[in-house]
Amino acid sequence: AILQSYALQKKLREIGTQPEIIDYRCDYISNPFRLVNLKKKGLFNYIYGAIGHICYIPRRFKCNKFRKHMRYSQPVTQGKMQPVAGKYDIYIAGSDQIWDYKLTNFDTTYFLDFVKEGKKKCSYAASIGENLPPEEYQQKYKKLLSDFDEILVREDYGADIVENLTQKRP
């Protein structure tokens, strides 16, 4: 995700814009070992995630060094997005599986739900996961995705899912 963010930010600078990455801190992802997550993930996934998190520490250190070459907003968290809600002309959500309800605990911030009306909302190489979301999420997905001005997804099956939900082909 960091390399894709860097490349997109670099390209946007080349065309004369001043892009800034919103330094969003998703609690479910940033604090995976909270006990409330044990219930949601199950014991096996919780332990597996803990091992993966430990193995990821050296990589995260390298990523943090790389981040120094990128322009970020002040850190923000869910429910406290006001500092960035109307700051930009265009908002771009993208990379990784930002729309996979299992990985983000269906954090709607990744759908740019905090953006003030009248601002453009786009996605770039977004991924939704491999399957159509369960029935209980589909209306929410439809509403959130329908608010986007442009949607670009990474995979063909992601385009199929978005089309199934919104009747618009990315």
Residue ranges and their predicted role:
Residues 4, 8-143, 163:
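Aromatic- and Gly/Pro-rich donor/ligand-binding loops
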Residues 98, 157-158:
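Alpha-helix capping/helix-boundary segments
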Residues 6, 155-156:
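Alpha-helix N-cap/helix-start capping motif
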Residues 16, 132, 149, 169-170:
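Secondary-structure boundary/capping signal
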Residues 148-155:
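A short beta-strand/loop micro-motif in the catalytic core of glycosyltransferases
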Residues 159-170:
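Helix-loop-beta element that forms the nucleotide-linked donor phosphate-binding surface
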